[in-house]
Amino acid sequence: MKVKRPILLAILDGWGLAEPDKGNAVDNANMIFVKQLKQTYPWLKAHASGKWVGLPENQMGNSEVGHIHLGAGRINLESLAKLNHETKTNNIAKNDEIVKTFEYVKKNNSALHLMGLFSNGGVHSHFDHMIAIYKAAIVYGITNIKFDLITDGRDTKPKLAYDFIKNLLELIKQNNNIGIISSVSGRYYAMDRDKRFDRSRIAYNAIVNRNNVRSFTNILDYIQQEYMINHDDEMIIPAFNQDDFNGNLKANDAIIMTNFRPDRAIQISSILTNKNYIAWQSEAFSDAEFIGDKIRFVSMMKYSDSVTSPHIAYPPKPLTNTLGQYLSKLGLKQLRIAETEKIAHVTFFFDGGNDYFKNGLAKNDEITLANAYIDLIPSAKVATYDLKPQMSAVEITDKLLEEIKKDEFDFIVLNFANCDMVGHTGNNKATEIACKTLDDQLKRIHDEFVLKHNGIMVITADHGNAEIMIDKDDQVNKKHTTSLVPIIITDKNIKLKQNDPAIAKVAPTILDLMNIEIPKEMELESMIDHN
């Protein structure tokens, strides 16, 4: 089977819509070609947050749920909503894996470590879930509880960890001082996902080895000291509690990792559980002690096959007949292309949790989805992406144009990470450069794919970010938004429906463009108006 006109889904990560403002990097970048696209082709303002992507009302969207819904064609109740329900009903205290972990700790007279991103951002985690497990452990009779906290500052305002941890200390006091904050680490270190193992090693030392790493005697003083040297929550240097020097993770201990979103939990969790994981062959871990075979590790959700612990509190239920899977069954040839930072998003997440591409790292002969191929473009090795706001967008486009010229693919999924990853740095001017870079790349792609190869581009985003770099309090905003996002379709011969456009309707719309029947699993309709 071959489609008449190939489709290219271009996902501009973190590219939202907002009123003109000094903090609107999208608008201030003067994306001339995008303006031309909007004047030439039909386009919509679409929902990409809250109930439209399976999240609680008014919850900002994120890259994971955005890509899931772009490929799903249905609203999928997401991890945050599920775990909020489990917490509200206290079912989390009855979860089989969690209860068995309590039993394990009591049997071994060992420590229970609660590790995760401690914030209310709701993108990777929510501290309510960790606190619920903490309270359940106390009820179960566990008294040796260690908190290995990861601070946020990226999906929240930059400096909220102080107040969050102050409240946790008060909660510990209210519970007869059961529990201690054993270590702290900014997510820059503990939640790296780009194989920067030197960062992971510092976090690992704070949790496990207690050597060659900072320490503190008062966690709140330590955070204040970090703030004074312009380290916000994301960048807090890992440290352990001197009053809990022997409270490091050790043999017979258990650790519950409370992050529910996989991508930034994979690396540190794989290091903690899998001696064959590539980090252990790196220079950063050449002299580290591995204890993963002597502990019980529980993840809230399935992260990756590289996390070798079998203990998953809420095992996944991957979606069926997502766009990529459906096109594969029909014999259509497809390509996924992105840089390292977002390769999992155009594979694992876009495929509804089905790991056909080994979380984006598979070689083409290892892909288990028929007729599917991948181009992984390395991300730049820089400390933060405002140092290179172009990221790897030009290199992605160069490779994509090579692929387009082959005339082989019926469907291409492309991710440009710039608006999101540079937006997360809080650097407004750098984010404007990032947006302008994408404007230039879109023109290159359009001129080749649409004008020379008769293709149709569907240009959209997974969530907002770069359009609000300064919040209503005139503070730097590094987090995602609830903004609407554009959907531009480069076909002058169609009209688009204006009733409740949403990114979850992109998959059926693409099938409609291909003149292919929409499967029953895709419960949402196409946005093309045939009247």
UniProtKB/Swiss-Prot annotation:
Top-level taxon: Bacteria
Molecular functions per Gene Ontology: manganese ion binding; phosphoglycerate mutase activity
Pathway, per record: Carbohydrate degradation; glycolysis; pyruvate from D-glyceraldehyde 3-phosphate: step 3/5
Binding-site list for Mn(2+) 1: D420, H424, H480
Gene, per the UniProt record: gpmI
Residue positions binding Mn(2+) 2: D13, S63, D462, H463
Taxonomic source organism: Mycoplasma capricolum subsp. capricolum (strain California kid / ATCC 27343 / NCTC 10154)
Membership in a protein family: Belongs to the BPG-independent phosphoglycerate mutase family.
Job description of the protein: Catalyzes the interconversion of 2-phosphoglycerate and 3-phosphoglycerate.
Catalytic activity reported: (2R)-2-phosphoglycerate = (2R)-3-phosphoglycerate
Catalytic residues (positions): S63 (phosphoserine intermediate)
GO biological process: glucose catabolic process; glycolytic process
EC number(s) recorded for this UniProt protein: 5.4.2.12
Protein name: 2,3-bisphosphoglycerate-independent phosphoglycerate mutase
